[in-house]
């Protein structure tokens, strides 16, 4: 079973996202800050991190950069209310970001995007 970490400082968002992912057949780990995410990644192996950008303390940008350098095999997707330009999004994708998911999202969209990210990861691992 694929394991996903959901990182957001809003407990309601974490709970909703966890519920949707668990109903989709995924194992879910949660964190409420960038620092907590990085601590948990030291101990737990995950396939994907769904990461909010705007959090107190360490931002999602900083967390993404640290994960990308230390564990490039772990996929990261941003979940955010922040709209970014297509140019900026492409730069992030070129730097290794797996996806940029706008909040609010519906459950089908979230599961479709997560399924696609993890399918691409599996295909690359098998190649």
How would you label these PLM feature ranges?
Residues 62, 82-99, 112:
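Alpha4 helix (beta4-alpha4-beta5 surface) of REC/receiver domains from two-component response regulators
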Residues 55:
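Receiver (REC) domain active-site loop signature in two-component systems and cognate sites
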Residues 39, 61-72:
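Short amphipathic alpha-helix used as the core "switch/output" element in two-component signaling
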Residues 45-50:
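Active-site beta3 strand of CheY-like receiver
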Residues 32-33, 59-62:
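Acidic catalytic/metal-coordinating carboxylates
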Residues 105-114:
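C-terminal output helix
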Residues 52, 80:
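Active-site residues of response regulator receiver
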Residues 11-29, 95:
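Two-component/phosphorelay signaling modules centered on CheY-like receiver
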